[in-house]
Amino acid sequence: AVERQIRVKGPDAEKFTDYVITRDATKISPMRARYVILCNYKGGVLNDPILLRISEDEFWFSLSDSDIGLYLQGVNADKRFNVEIDEIDACPVQIQGPKSLALMKDLIGDHVDLDNMPFYGLAEATVGGRSCVISQSGFSGEAGYEIYLRDATKYADDMWNAVVEAGKKHSLMVIAPAHHRRIQAGI
């Protein structure tokens, strides 16, 4: 499961991100996400997070593990890139499966056009009255969404209660990360 969000923000955010990933960061539009790979100097894989481009000058590396935040800070130890690199207080909840679209519509209303949201598309929304980033993504291999709650340590209960309440009519099942689903989906 995704547990950590490492933010790269500043005037050189795109340039720095492009330097550390194997994909072309300049081709990732704001409010889109992509699967990316970070390699060491020999080409060995360090991590393979989902990268969210929140704005022109802000990226989130969405990680399940590792110290990529420290690695990124080390890459920029000489401050040649004008960026801030930090772990932010944003935590995701996944809504996955064939009922995910209907549940999400009940949860956030018509504030986001979920019917036309592309895979790896992002949108700003509120859940339980709290600021979130929504992505159409997940590792279940089925339709799904991830809700990234901002200021999660303060507002997790508000978001969680809203998700559980909206999920009642959809027979929401709360489960822990199912890593076998990711393997079955070829992710």
Where are these regions (language model features)?
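Basic, glycine/lysine-rich polyanion-binding surfaces/domains
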Residues: 1-187
